[in-house]
């Protein structure tokens, strides 16, 4: 315990400062170092507290499901919500930082401050005195009867004992919303309260393991294993083939792939109602889901979003349950970002703050055809190798359980990734301090193509390319395997596509179920669901299209695409082929500008 020196001098000389016994001057107080032989300047109002670095607020959110694993969705002083890199946290007044539960923000928001007994000055005491919540929060009962913390002052506790709403708002548990006179917004989920005076061994302040960023978010993983919905919602398949979120648990997904109904009700699409034995309710509209993007460790294994890839003692990849984590030297444990591993105490340390470290779990094989993170859409890739092969480029690949590495010659080689080997310069692979034998040579994707592709007795193209006849005679090499040569003699398309010379694109035709549909005559008599104009109507789930006579016609697809010939239409997500008789999926379109141009062939020896 530090002893403060010169309090009487402090009162009399705030401007001049404090002169310590060793003649140095301190602005507030002098504190003797261990042993008492020397002194250091200190501030008793700050130095007797545990401090930790605050976190930066991230992207906007509506619920914890919008944030990476281990993050929380906190309400800011501006009334908005943002992701904080702590599982339970509060936003700082500066609007840019946040602190973990059990801490206060410093004035500038850059530091999180905690008293040694973890009993916060200004913390909200729950009835009974056994539990407390952070300042500017509200105590609410949880499902198990214990106390939880709503991260808003004077909040309204919802009857389900799971959610809460801001002061003055009412809970709409049917639609999972907080309703005010100005509008509505999603319900907030309560957090468990913390026991008062919680301390670790020898009085060392710690953070409860339940409050670590390793805590899983409250979310529902959809059947495709890559989309997720907020807690207390239901995944429903949309017409696009992706998953949407119905805003209630155990909901009924309607057959139109657009609406949903509460549990124990039936969808009545004709009347747009949810029917039950007692009463009918209006159909609910589904909301988009959020996609979970895996963290790739290498070409074969990955970790869930919000986790970090770390090497295990076996050399294989493991997953640390923190984002941007610190991998400990024992290859078994890991710590949150900003902490260091203390192997003797089995803890993670940041200044005076200590938290238990986490144990890594083995990484999982990457899911096939995993989508890329959001970004500008590029052209679909040409057909690749079988999923069991590890593709190095369009021509060569490695066997399963390997990674592609460049040899000294510039050619491809293979290292055994299943044993944790990494690529090294030259002819070797390495894992830790252990070298592997020489790299194995990669093999061609098609083992039968061991020589150039012969166009005729005079010309040939490299392996993995296709011979195409030129318009003026002779041959050109299409830089795609098994390609389709276009009739203009200048372009080519990947296998499975057809050439649309007029549109300068490669198109993949839809199956028979997506042939363009002829337009039907609209009705002028009865009152139907979709109004076209000029007193013309189409049935519900149909689309109004102009016909060739300038009048209205009905497309049998919901949100259909009207073809330019004014006689046909296509489903949503497709576009009409130039002649209007077929529908082409938008994702099955390759513009010629995005494809390699045919090159000159090689003379045969």
Curated annotation (Swiss-Prot):
Pfam families membership: Granulin
Compositional bias (Pro residues): 368-385
S-S bridge residues: 126-139, 133-149, 297-309, 303-319, 310-327, 320-334, 328-341, 335-348, 392-404, 398-414
Glycan-modified residues: 197
Coiled-coil region(s): none
A GO CC term attached to the entry: late endosome
GO MF: cytokine activity; protein-folding chaperone binding
GO annotation (BP), single: positive regulation of neuron apoptotic process
Protein origin, superkingdom: Eukaryota
Subcellular location(s) of the protein: Secreted; Lysosome
Chain positions covered by the region annotation Disordered: 359-386
Keywords: Cytokine, Disulfide bond, Glycoprotein, Lysosome, Repeat, Secreted, Signal
Subunit structure, as described in the record: Progranulin is secreted as a homodimer. Interacts with SLPI; interaction protects progranulin from proteolysis. Interacts (via region corresponding to granulin-7 peptide) with CTSD; stabilizes CTSD and increases its proteolytic activity. Interacts (via region corresponding to granulin-7 peptide) with SORT1; this interaction mediates endocytosis and lysosome delivery of progranulin; interaction occurs at the neuronal cell surface in a stressed nervous system. Interacts with PSAP; facilitates lysosomal delivery of progranulin from the extracellular space and the biosynthetic pathway.
Family in the record: Belongs to the granulin family.
PANTHER family: GRANULIN (PTHR12274), PROGRANULIN (PTHR12274:SF3)
The protein, known as: Progranulin
Organism: Cavia porcellus (Guinea pig)
Organism lineage: Eukaryota, Metazoa, Chordata, Craniata, Vertebrata
Gene name of the record: GRN
